[in-house]
Amino acid sequence: MSATLTARQLAAGHGNVELFSGLDLVVAPGDVIGLVGPNGAGKSTLLRMLAGIDLPERGTVSLSPPTATVGYLPQERDRRGGETVREVLARRTGVAAAQRALDAASVALERGERGADDAYAVALERWLGLGAADLDERADAVTAELGLTVELDRPVAALSGGQAARAGLASLLLSRYDVLLLDEPTNDLDLVGLAMLEDFVLARRAGTVLVSHDRRFLERTVDRVLELDLPQHKVNLYGGGYAGYLAERETQRRHARLEYEEYAETRAGLEARARAQRAWADKGVRNVRRNLASEPDRSIRAYRVESSQKQAAKARQTDKMIERLEVVEEPRREWELRMQVAAAPRSGAVVAVLRGAVVRRGPFTLGPVDLQIDWADRVAITGANGSGKSTLLAAMLGRIALDEGTASLGPGVVVGEIDQARALFVGGEPLLDAFATVSGLLPADARTLLAKFGLRADHVLRAAGTLSPGERTRAALALLQAAGVNLLVLDEPTNHLDLPAIEQLEQALDSYAGTLLLVTHDRHMLEVVHTTRHLEVNAGTVTDLG
């Protein structure tokens, strides 16, 4: 079904903070709109409003035709207990809800309830439109194409991380919503999955709104960009795709800064002139009063009085010019992380060694691996989901026991790590206390550092486990700045970070002088971060590509 979603004058806030207002958006068939903005700007909030899950503080959201389907597919951090892969696919494609509605309509039809015929027709049309009739057949084909070889009746809780990522992508590829809303669909996808997702989005004839931190994905898919500019409290819609958005935004910001600087310079000049004119007027008045009695010439006395009055009039005239100036507000500068990785003393020449290392986990086997990481190696590690990248890191760091072989870290190695699960800050202890304990900082210093990473009072006093993955990632990055490291291990560090933070992280990695192990599927990061070695992991086999 061809459908158009329209938002008019939407407004939303969080507590006393307004996120956005006056937001207008039309999502027509074939549109692919990228939604960008810093963490906390309201991107997920807006998607939930467009989906009809949350109500806006002001404004309306309408759908034409009203019977069209809208699919909101967020990232699901936790797997639902007892739910099978097949049930996940049915739920996230909307088929499960459509089946329940069709079953209820069938019962009403059998009972001969008033309006049951029309209700059944609507329910059946929705069931068919969402692809329920052939979901099982399509699910078998899509999961096979993705390499998800598990039985679809297997509980999702039993899946590996790579398998769970493939199941999530399968639910997206199987969806047939009339309007699709995607919240960070690229998280946890490998390069093959990213390519399949790009093809899916580009082939859709229905409208799509998506949030993503993957710059290559945005460049290749979106035709418009809606920016939630939190620092300026503005909503901006740009045409020309993601590249056009970046260019136009830079031009706008440059013009806004120049316009403000011109206004500020003009105002400062007028204010200086007014001060000088008032000073001359005041000086003239004092001189007139002092010399008036001693000056016998009446015309000279009149001239001096008139001169001081003219200076006062000029000052008033300049004040009016200042009042008539059209005020230009100073553009607010974006929050900048300005991160640096604190350096520890250099380690020994050999940083990490695996000799004949084998790790077995059920049917999966990593190795045998023979590998040596030397001081100042900058290693990119790539491979498909489930190929063993995270297992390789854990083996090198001694986080897991080997079934065969040996693993060792060299002398003087100090590890700084961001793991894929963001498991460092997950307990019930307040973030501030947990961070101070791990970092060794005093609470006041820990609070200051966390604030630099966008984690303020309402974050640091909450239980660490209640923070979002993005907030936990920021806390982990702050820890890297607090504690000196000489072996930096990053497993999918861009997941859950916004674009400004990712760019700051890339700059920090560029200046980092120690040893680096980087696992990422972010194609832009792989291009801009300097690496000296490339390890490829494929089904448990590690190949050093040099």
Stretch-by-stretch model annotation:
Residues 1-258, 342-546:
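ABC ATP-binding cassette signature C-motif
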Residues 115-141, 258-364:
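Flexible nucleotide-interacting loop at or near the entrance of a catalytic core
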